[in-house]
């Protein structure tokens, strides 16, 4: 089952609380997360520096969640364990899935890390592409799907994705492509 999040159905005044509820679901279900290194001119490195001691691995890949890039321009992904310290850092430092403030305007905060993804046993649980406003969840059962729906309004079945946003299909970069890249990492880091 796949769920797609459409934030048009999420009232702006609830965004901060909804993000924390979404974190609760992901923190209870995942064991690792990743962030992409942004290439923006002006960046806030606070999040990146806070997470630096917890890096499991840096990865350069041409395929990731909703990304398919040329070999000459790979994505730079950082993989982290999900533990009490990294949970606390994410809660305090990561301000929004789509890097906007509560009014829907781009904030002065432009982090050096974006595109938050959560994993469980090496499988994608939730993936985002911040600047494209893409967020999809892959709950393993109906109970977890309901927890996502209860945490934040705006989830729909994957058929909404197929009709309205074709990024992944058009680029032939399926959400599971990142699992291929992670197999090596998770097998090498059994502590994840």
Tell where the protein language model's regions lie, with residue ranges.
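Structured alpha/beta or helical-core interaction and ligand-binding surfaces enriched in interleaved
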Residues: 1-171, 175, 182, 186, ...
């Amino acid at each position: 089952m796949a769920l797609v999040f459409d934030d048009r159905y999420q009232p702006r005044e609830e965004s901060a609380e909804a993000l924390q509820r979404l974190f609760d679901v992901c923190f209870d279900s995942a064991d690792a997360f990743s962030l992409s290194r942004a290439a923006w001119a002006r960046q806030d490195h606070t999040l990146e520096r806070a997470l630096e001691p917890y890096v499991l691995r840096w990865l350069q890949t041409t395929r990731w969640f909703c990304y398919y890039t040329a070999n000459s321009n790979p994505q730079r992904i950082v993989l982290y364990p999900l533990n009490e310290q990294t949970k606390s850092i994410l809660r305090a430092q990561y301000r929004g899935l789509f890097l906007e403030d509560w009014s829907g305007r781009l904030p002065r905060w432009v982090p050096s890390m974006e595109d938050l993804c959560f994993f469980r046993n090496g499988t994608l649980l939730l993936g985002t592409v911040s600047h494209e406003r893409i967020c999809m969840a892959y709950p393993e059962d109906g109970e977890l799907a309901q927890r996502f729906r209860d945490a934040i309004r705006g989830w729909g079945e994957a058929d909404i994705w197929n009709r309205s946003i074709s990024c992944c299909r058009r680029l032939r970069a399926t959400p599971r492509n990142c699992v291929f890249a992670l197999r090596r990492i998770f097998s090498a880091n059994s502590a994840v």
